[in-house]
């Protein structure tokens, strides 16, 4: 008897990472941080680098042994190159990265052009850091101190790595080569769309890495200095809250710092549009510092801890909910392993909380803000305390609308990320599977504006299969 057609024609593709490997790195990260709490003689900068390395090194080793070649397509449709679209040139995602099986074939001339492209890129970034006053702030002092250690090592290792990678890349004429070709005056050979993608990828790293490293360094200092004997119930809440943020930042810093084909976590493509960049960078300093207090200030001095101070049991409930939501948020970052980065595509993640939602970090973070800020509660608190009901409704309405505006920013971020990642047929298959199996599938059936929008003309047949359930 022959088997009938499968009940679900689209399966969830495998993830670019393996969760147990990622959790191994997290366990080593936390263990290193705990050990360094007991060794105050270790400088804070050294402690920060050790904790980051404790996360990165186990992942690098385990992935090198277990996941080599994981980008080989598991489904015939995954090998179809993404069309030019917004990126500007065709990207064959099945041919990205290193060829581990073919013979090495480096070219000295190609290698030299790539080095010219590398040093040109770094010189431009150094110039930007020098002339932008924001980077002279004391916040970034740990980042500059880190570079004093990292730059000599980079100067030593990068030529050897570029020579090794050039001989093993499936597509050796990368962005570095095209930048070098442009500097050498080979305008007919330099591809402007590839130079643009190269510049955008480095802009992401140059913008986010200093900020995230500074935050990570600060969290390491706070973790090492925490005095457990002085913590009350709320103190323990914020300790675990900050521990979750520390793990999140550790994953983020490693993701931005290590972007190399050797680890298969290189950038496949970068968001090419202003409509994708603006809602992302507005959420970070210095832009949030300029706009947040003026237009999106939904918090007041009366957060959930203050408002519920007279109700300890309810305070515990809110603490558990908030920590649970932030746990999901951190879990989402851990799912990326070595591949975390805003505005870029570095491999499709389908495990961890991404097995249930395309945007678990955004959902959990935005929900946690509602529980933390309680922007609508002030009139009720003042009213039931006998302090009057009038005069508070306008403030509550304003705070609620401002938090809804922040939620809208993250909704736009989610939609533009989907648009960018849909350049990869593998992500299209994942998104269509999630449309049917994700925890938000009910919302997509009820409201078309939240439904996934795949590229037209490439997955219409699959979409019809999903709709019909055949």
Over which residues does each language-model region extend?
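Membrane-anchoring alpha-helices and their flanking helix-loop junctions
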Residues: 2-343, 372-470
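Alpha-helical membrane-protein architecture signal
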Residues: 346-354, 363
């Amino acid at each position: 008897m022959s088997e009938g057609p499968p009940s679900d024609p689209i399966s969830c593709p495998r993830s670019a990472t393996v969760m147990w490997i990622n959790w191994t790195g997290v366990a080593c990260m936390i263990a290193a941080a705990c050990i360094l709490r007991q060794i105050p003689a270790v400088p804070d900068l050294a402690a920060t680098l050790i904790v980051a390395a404790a996360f990165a090194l186990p992942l690098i080793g385990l992935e090198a042994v277990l996941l080599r070649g994981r980008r080989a397509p598991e489904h015939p449709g995954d090998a179809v190159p993404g069309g030019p679209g917004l990126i500007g040139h065709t990207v064959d995602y099945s041919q990205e990265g290193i060829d581990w099986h073919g013979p090495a074939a480096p070219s000295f001339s190609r290698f030299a052009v790539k080095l010219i492209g590398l040093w040109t890129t770094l010189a431009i970034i150094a110039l930007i850091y020098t002339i932008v006053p924001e980077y002279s702030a004391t916040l970034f002092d740990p980042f500059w101190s880190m570079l004093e250690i990292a730059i000599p090592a980079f100067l030593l290792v990068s030529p050897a790595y570029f020579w090794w990678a050039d001989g093993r890349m499936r597509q050796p004429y990368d962005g570095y080569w095209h930048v070098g070709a442009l500097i050498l005056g080979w305008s007919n050979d330099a591809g402007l769309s590839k130079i643009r993608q190269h510049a955008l990828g480095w802009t992401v790293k140059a913008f986010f890495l200093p900020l995230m490293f500074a935050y990570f360094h600060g969290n390491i200092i706070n973790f090492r200095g925490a005095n457990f004997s002085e913590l009350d119930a709320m103190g323990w809440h914020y300790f675990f809250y900050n521990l979750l943020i520390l793990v999140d930042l550790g994953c983020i810093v490693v993701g931005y710092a290590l972007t190399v084909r050797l680890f298969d976590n290189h950038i496949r493509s970068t968001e090419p549009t202003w409509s994708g960049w603006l809602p992302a960078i507005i959420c970070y300093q210095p832009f949030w510092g300029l706009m947040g207090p003026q237009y999106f200030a939904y918090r007041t001095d009366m957060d959930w801890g203050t408002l519920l101070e007279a109700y300890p049991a309810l305070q515990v409930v809110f603490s558990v909910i908030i920590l649970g939501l932030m746990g999901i948020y951190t879990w989402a970052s851990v799912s990326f392993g070595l591949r975390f980065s805003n505005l870029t595509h570095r491999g499709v993640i389908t495990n961890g909380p991404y097995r249930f939602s395309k945007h678990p970090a955004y959902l959990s973070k935005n929900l946690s803000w509602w529980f933390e800020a309680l922007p609508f509660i002030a009139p009720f608190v003042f009213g039931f305390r006998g302090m009057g009901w009038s005069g508070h409704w306008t403030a509550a309405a304003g705070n609620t609308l401002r938090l809804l505006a922040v939620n809208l920013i993250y909704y736009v971020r989610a939609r533009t990320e989907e648009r960018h990642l849909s350049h990869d047929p593998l992500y299209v298959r994942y998104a269509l599977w999630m449309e049917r199996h994700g925890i938000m599938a009910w919302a997509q059936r009820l409201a078309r504006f939240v439904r996934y929008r795949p590229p037209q003309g490439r997955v219409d047949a699959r979409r019809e299969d999903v709709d019909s359930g055949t």
